Each structure stands twice: as structure tokens, then as C-alpha cells.
């Protein structure tokens, strides 16, 4: 037996669940926890970000790459109020993340406007689990529950609120931290009749497509996906979170779909007469449901029953693990009526797939070919590909540049493309890139960001330099929120709220001790990238670009000006209405 502080129990519980990285912010409520970390093996694995929001994005970047809550946040009371945006991304993007919120003295709870009492209930709509710990002997149990929920299905954020007086209190530690708990393995088998029905639909379709989402990556299903696609000769489209689960150099790879996706993928989805959806929420980022995609008949497979049939109505809904379902499918396909064991290159739909992919590849090459300035962002990505290795990670922020970053990256592995995939939150890129670099120190991390996005978190260059995180940041500058500049001009003939002045980005990077360089000729991009790599430092490369290239102008994702919402004519309610929303019945398209 030993007498231990609550802070020590918190650290021991995090160690028990395999925490690799701690991102924490100091304040009076986190003093005891900071001291406890310094005395543990995690003391050398603590990052103190410039802001709590930047730190929460680092946690997301780390855990997205690792596919578990390997990084944990520990935050000083009022700083917790900055976490919500990153936690919302973790929820809808299915990123496992445990956050420890250290609140003010618990004896003040419930008093009218007590100083610095964080309303922990504000996390309830966002986190998949929100707990308030009010007894010291419950600390370990609460953290155990947080990991169980965060790494479950669906994955997401879990928040544990602990009053800081408990971190200073002492108690006999016997049996207070659950020991030997194992993570549940999600191996959900589908009913045999559902597997046979899916196999029959796949074989009978003239132009089938497999849509592979992030659930395929999380299940470790890349090998099964490759075997299934080649066995049936079915082209593979991925969602944004599924990018890389199928090697994008393969002849059956159509790339990622959606409004930031590849045109070959969107064309393939539009031409399909049947889609096998594996491990996807069917969200806007995954397939651009709000803009372009009308689904044919499809079978929807996911571990989360809550996402089945919520937007589209599938022919068959299956609650199953993506990898397990594919393995079941591979087993029954040879006995399915109409199945032919022939090379995928000989199947009828292969020619159409190659035509779509060739057209897309040709278009991308055209975008990469120009030598003029402002530079093409596709050209920048072409130069990145020359130095990119299979293990390297591409991170993009949100804006016009997102399309060239998605379209220019050719991935061989899952979880190599990182951004705010679920919510599209501006400013996520730089801290997520730092988190990804922390998670995989032997990988190169290339970030593409707009100047507007970089304004959010450029202060985290301190973390990059202090911890020797050699992220290579390409900041595409045009002194505007380019996507909105284009759309505002298209719709209203003016660009209010979209332009701003830039600082000396290269000078700022150098002031922090990072490498910095400004590109003034397109032909200099390759050399700048190599010099950044050779420096071994965090690096910033400024690349001037136009305001119009990318998401809002190029229709390859089926979007472009289609992002604009046409107003509807709503009749005036002159007599009043007894029922809220009554006039919605009379809306005109």
C-alpha cells in the first residue's frame, strides 16, 4: 500500500492505457498533474502548446494517424472552453481522443458564477462520454471508462472533468487504478444471409463500385479490400478518411470521392448501378452527398448502426466490421451464381474505369505543367510526390488548396492524408501536422495551408522548433480566403470580408528558429522542398498562388460554383401561424 495524490492516480491510469503522448496546458488547476507527469516516464512525452485549441488539434492529428487514443489532453480549467471545435471534429470524424479537464475547486461547484468553474456539461453534446469525478477513489475508474468509449465503435472524444482539489488530495492507492484491462476487439460478423445477398448483388451488377471508408482503415482491412476488388474486378472509390486503404497506383483505384475528391471517383460513383459501402458514414466529405451524388442501390456495412439509413436508404443495412465482412464475402463469392473467376483486366467494366482514371490523370498533369507565376498548387504537389515516400504524411488545411492537396497526393497506405475531414474547420492544418509528426517521427510530414488558415496557429512554430518537429509547411499566399473570394464574386460581384494583408511569413518562421524560404519562380519549388528537407528543421515555404485555382473554381469535385445556395421564395405569413414551421410546407424551389 501507498498513499498517493489524485494527480499521481491520473498519471498511473493514463500509463495503464498505453498513453504515448501528453498535450497539456499549465494553470493553477493543473499544477499537481504537471508535477506528477514530471515524475513519470511520460514526463519526456509532454507537449505544452501555445494554445489549448492548438493542442487539441495536435491530439487529433496524433490519434488519427495512430487510430487510437495514444495522445491525451490535460487542460487547465478555463482553457477547456477552447477545446470544443477540435472535439467536435473528433466526434464526427471518429477520432479517438481522451481529454482530462482540470476544473476549479470542487467545493465551489454550484455557487452562483463561482470563479473559473468550467461548465463541464457543455461537452455533453460533443463528447461521446462526459464524466464529472467527485470522489478521489473514482479517478481511475472514470479514466478507464473514457478510454473504453473513445476507442469504441464509433470512436470519438471522451471528456473527464476532475476538480483540481482532488489532484492534491491523498488516498491509499490500493485497487484504485484498474489493472490488466484489455481493449475490446471489434470483430463483428455479418449474418450469413446478408453476406450471400451482398455477394449476389455484387456479381449481378453491370457496373459495381466498392466505396471504402475510414472503417476499412480502422479494421485493418486493406489486404482484404485488395483481394476482394481483384477477385470480383470492381473499381474502388474511397472516402476522404479511407484514402490510401487501397493503393492509389492500382489500376482499379479511382481515388477519393467528394467535393474535394478526384473526378475519376465522382464519375465512377455517378455511373455505378450498385455500390458496396464499407465503413463509411456517407458524409459530404466522403461522397459530397449535398452536392453531386445520387446513390444507386447499395449495401451499407458499418459497425455503427446509427449511420445506416440516415441519409440514403440502402438495399441492405449490415452492422459488421469492414474487414470481417470482406473476408466473409471472399469466402462465399466463388459459390455465388454468375460469379466468374477471371482476371479483373478482362471484366467488362474495367475499360470504363481506366478511361475515367486516365482522364483525371491527364487533367492533373495539365494543372501541373505550367511554369508561370502565381504558381499552380497542383505543381507544388507534383514536386512533393518526387520526394514523398510511402510512409510520409500529407496534411492539408481547409480552402481552395484542399482540392490540389487531395488530388495531387498519391497514397499507398491508410491514414497518410490528414485534415478536418468531418467538419472542414479552418486552421486545423498546422497543429494536426505537428500531431502527426509526433506520432510518426520517422515519416516526413508535408503540410499545405492557405495564408488565411495559417493565421490561426502559426504561434505553434514554437512547439515545432522546441521539439524538433521537421514539418514542411507550404503556405499558399494570395492575401485572401480564396474559396470565398471566388464564390462571393461569382454570386454577388464583390468580395466583402475575403481579403486581408499578410505579414512576412518567412521572417516569422525564421524568428522562431525554423527554416524559411519564399518561392518566386515555379521552377524553384523543387529546390525549396529539398533545402527544407536537408535543413532538418521545421520549415516554411511561401508559394504565391492565384485566388481562383482550387476548390471553388475547378469543377472536378462536382462543386465549383455549385457550392452556392440558391435562395427560395418564402410566402409572407400575413395572418399569423398557429404552428411553427407551417410555411415550410409552401416553400418554392
UniProtKB/Swiss-Prot annotation:
The segments labelled Thiamine pyrophosphate binding in the record are: 400-480
Cofactor binding note from Swiss-Prot or TrEMBL: Binds 1 Mg(2+) ion per subunit.
Q: What is this protein called?
A: Cyclohexane-1,2-dione hydrolase
Indicate the quaternary assembly.
Homodimer.
Query: Keywords of this protein's UniProt record, alphabetized?
Result: FAD, Flavoprotein, Hydrolase, Magnesium, Metal-binding, Thiamine pyrophosphate
Where thiamine diphosphate is bound, by residue? 52
Residues bound to Mg(2+) are 451, 478
- What does the sequence similarity comment in the record state about its family? Belongs to the TPP enzyme family.
Q: Which cofactor does it need?
A: Mg(2+); thiamine diphosphate; FAD
An example of a Gene Ontology BP annotation on this entry? isoleucine biosynthetic process
E.C. number: 3.7.1.11
Tell me what organism the protein belongs to: Azoarcus sp
Job of this protein: Catalyzes the ring-opening cleavage of the alicyclic alcohol cyclohexane-1,2-dione.
Q: Name one Pfam family in it.
A: TPP_enzyme_C
Domain of life where this protein originates: Bacteria
